[in-house]
Amino acid sequence: MSKQPSLSYKDAGVDIDAGEALVERIKSVAKRTARPEVMGGLGGFGALCEIPAGYKQPVLVSGTDGVGTKLRLALNLNKHDSIGQDLVAMCVNDLVVCGAEPLFFLDYYATGKLNVDVAATVVTGIGAGCELAGCSLVGGETAEMPGMYEGEDYDLAGFCVGVVEKAEIIDGSKVATGDALIALPSSGPHSNGYSLIRKIIEVSGADIETVQLDGKPLTELLMAPTRIYVKPLLKLIKDTGAVKAMAHITGGGLLDNIPRVLPKGAQAVVDVASWNRPAVFDWLQEKGNVDETEMHRVLNCGVGMVICVAQEHVEVALNTLRDAGEQPWVIGQIAAAAEGAAQVELKNLKAH
């Protein structure tokens, strides 16, 4: 008879009971997000969802994303309540720019040692994000992987599927010289540029838990959840039919994201003096001595979404967005690009 002790999965660092406890904790979160098209609840091998009624030629649109190294900041600050909304926002905002209505969302949560309370807090934030976007949280994967992550550190990925009528796909092909560009404000850096942000914090030696900007703690400004623009934008599309293109301003800022939806030969001329940049960006620029162009190439600088409409539709677009609770403004317009010119020109860049 072997004297070797009998090993269990728990001995290897994987707690099946903790995983099952988490599933029970988050069932109510998923239930709150349920859409009528979703068939069944959590726990099956695959999540089933019907195409909503009323579509003639439905096209499915998919996206996946993470939250970058904002997660490291969340772990350092032990603040996990809003990172789930960030995850949803990064996915659904990418879907809505082509006119799609998000249908369902799945998440992947990987960790070295599962902390059920932390994971439940994260998933509750995912559920809140799904409610804001009008999509169902239909499932996910929680992977406890000892030896792959340090302690209770975790990583997140999100996956979303939406639907759009084929004839109503928004792809930027109708963008024309003279069209207006409308901006929607961000809540802060959203979920991009955090490797630079963390480097600035490190180099400056700033205690971000004591710094206040405009009467708010810097940590609150840096961890503000990414805004979810789905419902106001779907209302704008449905009520006006005026939207020619939209760009979700993520990593790469205005300079890299607007060109993704512009046709060849079009240039976006953006007036950076058309809005007051939130104080958090000025603090980051000052503490990191960051070049002005680099700021706009890495961070959103206060702009979370850019919408292109014809000039004659500017007022109705602005009013529709305001009625939906947004604070839009005209940020620039479309011009004909000169030979070899960049597809985005930033006017009134301040000297740094």
Curated annotation (Swiss-Prot):
It is found in: Cytoplasm. This is Phosphoribosylformylglycinamidine cyclo-ligase. It comes from Pseudomonas fluorescens (strain Pf0-1). It catalyses: 2-formamido-N(1)-(5-O-phospho-beta-D-ribosyl)acetamidine + ATP = 5-amino-1-(5-phospho-beta-D-ribosyl)imidazole + ADP + phosphate + H(+). GO terms for cellular component: cytosol. Its EC number is 6.3.3.1. Belongs to the AIR synthase family. The lineage of its organism: Bacteria, Pseudomonadati, Pseudomonadota, Gammaproteobacteria, Pseudomonadales. One of its GO terms (biological process) is 'de novo' IMP biosynthetic process.
